[in-house]
């Protein structure tokens, strides 16, 4: 297991958050390309709907990170009643530190962007599981199964 990289990013309300703010809790940290796009909205709403179940199983918090602005995150969170922190990383430093920034292909075009990755971080700040290139529709249910397995240990 490797140590989760620390960060200092603003949430959708302009509050500065770091890894220490979530210390002692399991963290479901997911990286997504862009607010208010079909796949990202589906993923965020699935996490919203699963959050209570995620918290009951392990007490985990959900944190979403993209390079969108604080204002964009605020509108996105309000529009979809998102009940977790969305952190803004416009310079993609944290996104890069977690390995979620890199080359992508879309409609025959190559560019650099955010990979739809999720990291499960232990209360001790260790990355215990990586989900790379997740399917936004099926990801939350898989995560709940994995958290339930961890809770049994």
Where are the language model's segments positioned?
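Chalcogenol-based redox active-site neighborhoods
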Residues: 1-153
């Amino acid at each position: 297991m490797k140590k989760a990289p620390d960060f200092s990013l603003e949430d959708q309300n302009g509050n500065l958050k770091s890894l220490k703010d979530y210390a002692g809790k399991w963290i479901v940290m997911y990286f997504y390309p862009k607010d208010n796009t079909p796949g990202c909205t589906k993923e965020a709403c699935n996490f919203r709907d699963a959050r209570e179940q995620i918290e009951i199983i392990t007490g985990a918090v959900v944190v979403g990170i993209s390079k969108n602005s604080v204002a964009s995150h605020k509108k996105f969170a309000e529009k979809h009643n998102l009940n977790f922190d969305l952190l803004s990383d416009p310079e993609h430093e944290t996104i890069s530190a977690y390995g979620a920034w890199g080359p992508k292909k879309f409609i025959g075009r190559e560019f650099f962007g955010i990979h739809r990755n999720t990291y499960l971080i232990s209360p001790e700040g260790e990355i215990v599981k990586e989900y790379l290139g997740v399917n936004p529709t099926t990801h939350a249910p898989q995560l709940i199964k994995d958290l339930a397995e961890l809770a049994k240990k």
